[in-house]
UniProtKB/Swiss-Prot annotation:
Its main location: nucleus. GO terms for molecular function: DNA binding; DNA-binding transcription factor activity, RNA polymerase II-specific. This is Homeobox protein HD-11. Residues 30-89 bind DNA. It is found in: Nucleus. Keywords: DNA-binding, Homeobox, Nucleus. It holds the Pfam family Homeodomain. CDD domains: homeodomain (cd00086). PROSITE patterns: HOMEOBOX_1, HOMEOBOX_2. One of its GO terms (cellular component) is nucleus. InterPro entries: HD (IPR001356), Homeobox_CS (IPR017970), Homeodomain-like_sf (IPR009057). Gene3D superfamilies: Homeodomain-like.
Length: 138
């Protein structure tokens, strides 16, 4: 079990490494037009936001490759979400945000990111929403 998980992790890291070496192909992303995020992408971003309000640059790049969203878009999503919490002025949200602002960027390990994406993919699929994801990603 451990060796299989280690092998899967190495394969995942190798695949992400190759994608990073090749660089982001801008034609993969729709340029000049605003794109709505799919339900899967939004669920994954919300789950990451629960873990860290300030993900590191490495985490953002890894996440961008895993959910097929441009890193700048992910960065702006986190900024907008933090701002929305501040604007609402909810006591709980403001306290959580104030606590996290004291910390610097958090690096979330790749296996955890991959697990979160897989869990959210299963959840979206379980509720019959995978059709929405497939249509939106085309």
């Amino acid at each position: 079990m451990t060796s299989e998980r280690t092998k899967n992790l190495r394969e995942l890291e190798a695949a992400l490494g190759l994608l990073k070496l090749s660089g982001f192909q801008m034609n993969r992303y729709c340029t000049g037009k605003q794109m709505r995020k799919t339900r899967l992408q939004t669920c994954v971003l919300n789950r990451i936001f629960e873990i860290s309000r300030f993900p590191s640059s490495k985490t953002i790049v890894d996440l961008a490759l895993l959910i097929n969203v441009h890193p700048k878009s992910i960065q702006k999503w986190f900024q907008n979400t933090r701002q929305a919490i501040r604007k609402k002025g909810s006591t709980k949200g403001a306290l959580l945000l104030a606590e996290s602002e004291e910390h610097s960027a958090v690096d979330i390990p790749l296996p955890i990111l991959a697990d979160i994406v897989e869990i959210e993919r299963r959840t979206v699929s379980k509720f019959g929403l995978e059709r929405v994801f497939l249509q939106d990603s085309n």
